[in-house]
């Protein structure tokens, strides 16, 4: 209702939004998964909302959720489910979930807290402290979850944000910076898909890449061969460990058209953030792209960079004007 009545869209914009929601809705019907539809609805509803306020809300929401879960585990209400790492890297490690059901889910929520914290505390005086706390949190959670995807993506976000804070004004002065970011984002997706589609078990190169990505290449390759890709997805029941990479899970389960629209939304977000000089948002978007090579959790409407597609962004150089 807000999108169509109160957001003051033009007729052309409303027709475009309606078409997108129709296509994503068809994908929801065929796949039985509402994640993409929820993403688009919430992002469209965020039109002209203050982006920094959204970051603040999500930060405290993620913080409260993590704290509540830990308290409930300590009180014996929730169970700390344990599992063992059976992959080559860190074989035999005990992994804790602390009330989230799976260690990777605990790592995912910590990742979301770090992402939102990096975007919520952008002031120069607080950047170093924010990054230091994020590093300590990432390693502490990794010690108990052994979630490599969450650790690597958290560290990537921290490093990229530090670089963005330093060279952001210089990047904003270069006309090639925005096309370069968009191209690199697409190149990363294309690289993973190429490796998955060309994957061969006997190759030492592919075996090394597969080990680094916690067997995601092998599972993705097998899924593409077994199930293929449909325009609007399907309710796929995997007979082996789930295909966790978003770049494989989305086209197979959610459908080609909804997947293209979703990543198109990500590209628009990166474009608007870069144009506004908000290179911290671009940095977190790239860290999220790294995480998506191993997990599909960011297909839920919790990845803050995608809200930059419609929300009001304060221009970094003066923090007064907005786009």
What do these predicted ranges mean?
Residues 162-207:
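A membrane-periplasm/extracellular boundary helix in multi-pass inner-membrane enzymes
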Residues 6-15, 122-130, 175, 270-284:
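Membrane-interface helix-loop-helix junctions at transmembrane boundaries of multi-pass membrane enzymes
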Residues 67-103, 207-208, 235:
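Membrane-interfacial helix-loop-helix modules of multi-pass inner-membrane proteins that assemble, modify
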């Amino acid at each position: 209702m807000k999108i169509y009545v109160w957001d003051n869209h033009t007729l052309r914009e409303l027709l475009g939004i309606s078409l997108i929601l129709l296509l994503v809705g068809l994908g929801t019907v065929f796949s039985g998964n509402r994640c993409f539809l929820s993403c688009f609805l919430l992002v469209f509803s965020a039109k002209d909302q203050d982006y920094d306020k959204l970051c603040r809300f999500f930060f405290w929401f993620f913080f409260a959720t993590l704290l509540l879960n830990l308290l409930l585990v300590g009180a014996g209400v929730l169970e700390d489910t344990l599992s063992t790492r059976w992959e080559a890297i860190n074989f035999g490690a005990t992994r804790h979930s602390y009330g989230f059901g799976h260690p990777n889910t605990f790592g995912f929520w910590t990742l979301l807290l770090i992402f939102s914290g990096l975007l919520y505390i952008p002031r120069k005086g607080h950047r170093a402290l924010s990054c230091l706390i994020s590093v300590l949190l990432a390693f502490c959670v990794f010690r108990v979850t052994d979630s490599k995807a969450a650790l690597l993506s958290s560290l990537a976000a921290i490093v990229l944000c530090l670089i963005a804070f330093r060279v952001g004004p210089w990047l904003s002065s270069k006309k090639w910076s925005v096309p370069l970011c968009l191209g690199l984002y697409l190149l990363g997706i294309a690289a993973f898909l190429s490796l998955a589609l060309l994957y061969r078990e006997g190759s030492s190169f592919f075996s090394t890449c597969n080990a680094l990505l916690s067997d995601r290449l092998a599972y993705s390759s097998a899924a593409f061969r077994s199930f293929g890709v449909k325009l609007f997805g399907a309710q796929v029941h995997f007979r082996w460990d789930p295909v966790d990479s978003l770049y494989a899970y989305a086209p197979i389960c959610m459908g080609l058209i909804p997947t293209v629209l979703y990543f198109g939304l990500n590209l628009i977000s990166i474009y608007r953030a870069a144009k506004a000089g908000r290179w911290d948002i671009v940095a977190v978007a790239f860290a999220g792209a790294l995480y998506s090579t191993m997990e599909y959790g960011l297909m839920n409407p919790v990845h803050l960079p995608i809200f930059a597609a419609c929300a009001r962004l304060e221009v970094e150089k003066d923090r007064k004007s907005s786009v």
